[in-house]
Swiss-Prot record:
InterPro entries: G_TrmE, GTP-bd, GTP-bd_TrmE_N, GTPase_MnmE, MnmE_dom2, MnmE_helical, P-loop_NTPase, Small_GTP-bd. It is an enzyme of class 3 (hydrolase). (6S)-5-formyl-5,6,7,8-tetrahydrofolate binds at residues 22, 79, 119, 453. GO terms for cellular component: cytosol. This is tRNA modification GTPase MnmE. Belongs to the TRAFAC class TrmE-Era-EngA-EngB-Septin-like GTPase superfamily. TrmE GTPase family. Keywords: Cytoplasm, GTP-binding, Hydrolase, Magnesium, Metal-binding, Nucleotide-binding, Potassium, tRNA processing. Homodimer. Heterotetramer of two MnmE and two MnmG subunits. It is found in: Cytoplasm. The lineage of its organism: Bacteria, Pseudomonadati, Pseudomonadota, Gammaproteobacteria, Alteromonadales. One of its GO terms (molecular function) is GTPase activity.
Amino acid sequence: MTTDTIVAQATAPGRGGVGIIRISGDKASDVAMAVLGHLPKTRYADYCDFKSASGQVIDQGIALFFKGPNSFTGEDVLELQGHGGQIVLDMLIKRVMEVGGIRIAKPGEFSEQAFMNDKLDLTQAEAIADLIDATSEQAAKSALQSLQGEFSKEVHELVDQVTNLRLYVEAAIDFPDEEVDFLSDGKIANALYKIIDKLDLVQASAKQGSIIREGMKVVIAGRPNAGKSSLLNALAGKESAIVTEIAGTTRDVLREHIHLDGMPLHIIDTAGLRDTTDTVEQIGIERAWNEINSADRVLFMVDGTTTAAVDPHTIWPDFVDRLPSNLGVTVIRNKADLTGEDLMMTEEQGYSVYRISAKTGLGVEELKQHLKSLMGYQSNLEGGFIARRRHLEALELAAGHLQLGKEQLEVYLAGELLAEELRMCQLALSEITGRFTSDDLLGKIFSSFCIGK
């Protein structure tokens, strides 16, 4: 943990109505005396001159002083709010540096200091960056929920429950006379099952929070001339892809980023899949499979005029066999305007099958609702929180340890091994909030922040 005094511009670079310089550390009060000539009253806005070492006025504006630990970083903090011209702000930072013992802050260092001083935990610190980077209203709302501690609260409750159960198991092992057959009396099993159920709910919420932040990647795949590019255009609401009657028109990957009621969706149109001797087309098909293998969902486009089948194993078994085993597939029977099929959804052999006309737009709205449901969309997400991929990985790791602990309890009645799995679960959960986190991870997280945050 650094004890340096740091300074940075807190507002975006460039011209603006207001520009803010933020200073945090022991020398913040020295800066106030040097630049303002006095120390402003704590937590009061003070309109004054910002002066150079020779007494010349650099700018005029509002000075705010926050005495640590009652500040964002937990240290003494001084904010100088002046005019937003970049030259003026650069002059002001240069003046602050003249005080001595002050350096320019690294990206995210103010938030890192707040984390180190227990003003917020790691999920709250990450939520600051997520709030700034939010690309939709729902993402902003969810990031604010995380900033206010909604995600942290869920994780802390889980950690407390796991810790209490672990202590009970270890105490029963150390003092066997106090609890006879403690592993088979049902108390531990019931407590463990409740924790597993609670973690399942948190995982589901975190997965949705991750989708809100990062979006779901949906790849449109199928044979040439099945209508893939027409579907991309219909979902995007604009002519993003060239559409012709010539099979193989699309030879490269096309991407569109849209929002469905605040839920970000990454739509990928790919080259038609077929055997070909055309070198350029072969490259496009290889890229298509790369996108399919990293997708969250595949929309398998079928030209409804070529087959009446609905089961993808019947339509194209080689395609289905090559798909990753855990990849979800939605079958899209296209060209319903030509086949006369009813625009409806059915479940066939575990697959959702939609009949649409990408050309006319018939059935596309129903498909959008399907995609929203896959993303876990709810009309009221006021209690939702934002989540990152590392959070999902930590929750998955914690869930794995709980399942191993459950096996040790149910199959082997191994109290010591159950206690160890609970300890590992506790560590995985605590890494989410930063209670137990490596310096490398902290550096990676905070380095992605804006300077001045």
